[in-house]
Design a protein with these regions (language model features):
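Charged catalytic and DNA/RNA-contacting regions of genome-maintenance
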Residues: 1-184
Length: 184
């Protein structure tokens, strides 16, 4: 609703890429008031339909970000407009930044050296070193890219908003059962 968008302290970054026979979606969210952050990544079949973006819709409805950065690769403007509506971003976000994968800052967020630097800057040296701290980041490449871009974006706009940010909670879990309208 419009009221929940006005009350949200969340900023999200959605990273979408089409590759081979699938669409990969990496998502990152920061609550700038509490410092909580979360990431999620999903793969879906390569088709442009509302059900393709169900997990994105779940993520958006759970966090209701008032500002969203959407980074796309191999998506047309029309498809981006559609997914903003499919996922409910158009109704909850007051501000949507749309970026293509060719953007310099986006290209930088793809580089592992830069990702480690950002993780170390915001979460301490242990998160920036190779080891257990980076294990989940390594297995969720697009969620990591989304978080890297989002951390830098928020820091550039107001460094105090990410001064005491907590390590991100990975919302990827396999113990959820998904029921769609046609499954009952």
């Amino acid at each position: 609703t419009a009221e929940s968008a006005a009350l949200s302290n969340c900023v999200a970054c959605i990273w979408l890429e089409r590759m081979r026979a699938k669409t990969v979606i990496g998502m990152a969210n920061i609550d700038v008031f509490t410092g909580r952050s979360s990431v999620f990544e999903t793969e879906t079949e390569l088709m442009h339909a509302p059900t393709t973006y169900d997990e994105l819709e779940r993520f958006i409805s759970a966090h209701a970000p008032s500002e969203v950065i959407i980074i796309t690769d191999n998506f047309s403007q029309r498809e981006v407009e559609d997914l903003l509506n499919f996922a409910g971003i158009a109704t909850c976000a007051r501000l949507v930044h749309r970026l293509e994968s060719g953007n310099d800052a986006v290209q930088r967020a793809k580089k592992q050296v830069y990702q480690r630097e950002i993780m170390a800057r915001f979460f301490g040296p242990a998160m920036g070193s190779v080891g257990s701290g980076l294990m989940q980041f390594a297995t969720h490449e697009f969620a990591t890219q989304a978080l890297t871009y989002l951390l830098n974006f928020v820091h550039e706009h107001n460094p105090h908003l990410v001064h005491r940010i907590a390590e991100p909670a990975f919302e990827n879990c396999s113990d959820r059962m998904v029921l769609a309208n046609h499954s009952l």
